[in-house]
Amino acid sequence: MTHDISETPTAPVSRYYTAPDGLKLHVLDWSGPSDAIPVVCLPGLARTAADFSALATRLARTRRVLALDYRGRGLSQWDADWKNYSLAVENADILAVFTAMGVDRATIVGTSRGGLHAMLLSATRPTLLHAVVLNDIGPAIEARGMARIRGYVGKLPAPKSWADAADLARFTMGEQFSGLDAADFEAYARLTFEEKKGVFSTRYDPALLKTLEGLDLSAPLPTMWPQFEGLRDIPTLVIRGANSDLLSAETVDEMARRHPSLEAYVVPGQGHAPLLLDTPSIERVAAFVEGN
C-alpha cells in the first residue's frame, strides 16, 4: 500500500522556532517552487510531522510543504505543564510558526487534531486559509472513537524490536485498518516509535494522556459547527476512513449540507485516521491542492 517516494525532489530540512512562551518547536520544511501557495501539514494528537513525509514529497513537486511537530511531540520540546497541551496554546504556536516562517497564506492539511486547528484558524486568522484538507475529522466527534484513543495514548508498552513494534501497531490499530498488510504496519510502527541504543519509546510526551482523562465520554462531545462554517467560502476536502469510529458518515453528510462546495473522499480499509501513505489518497490530496 505504501507510496513510492523514491522521486524525492529534496530531503526535508529540520527548522526550529520559538513558541510565544519560549518552548522550542520543530518544523520539517520541504522546499518547492515558490510561486505556488505553500502547504502546511498539522498532525494528530499523538502524531508527528514525519507522518506527512510521503504526501509532502509528492506535493513538493509543485510547492513548498511544511509539517509541524506540536509541543511535546516529535522533535519539539516537551512542556513541563501538561495543561499547555491544549488547542488554544497549540493554535498560538501554529500562528507563531507561520509568522516566523513568513507564511501569510497556506493550504492546511490537518489530520484529526490538525483539522480542529484548521477550523479554529477560520475564526482566529481566516486570511491565512487558502484551502483546507480535513483528514478524518469534522465538527462533531464520536465519543467511541475518543474512548478508543484514550485507551492507548500514553499507555503503550515499549516494544523490544521493530518486529515487536509492528505487532503492537497491528494489535492496537488492526480493527480500524483492515486493509493494511504487514509492511504497512511496520511503516506505521516506524512513524509511531523511535529507537535509541536499543531502547524504544513513543514519539510524544506520555503526559498527553492527562489531557484526555477528564473527558466525559458518557455525554455528547462539544461540537465545532460555527468554526466549520467559517470554512464555507474556502475550498475544503474532507477525507474519511471507511472504518472510522471518530468521523461518522452522517457528520460528513451534514458538513456537505452546510458547505455546498465541500469535496469528500473515502479511504477503503482504513479507519481513524487515514495514513496518507497509499498512492490513491496521496494523488487525491495532490489533485485538490493543485486544483486550488
Regions found by a protein language model. Give the residues of each.
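Active-site loop/oxyanion-hole signature of alpha/beta-hydrolase fold enzymes
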Residues: P20, S53-T57, A67-V109
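Conserved HGGG/HGGXW glycine-rich cap/lid loop of the alpha/beta-hydrolase fold
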Residues: L23-W78
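Conserved hydrolase catalytic core segment
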Residues: D104-A143
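Conserved serine/cysteine hydrolase catalytic core
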Residues: K196-R257
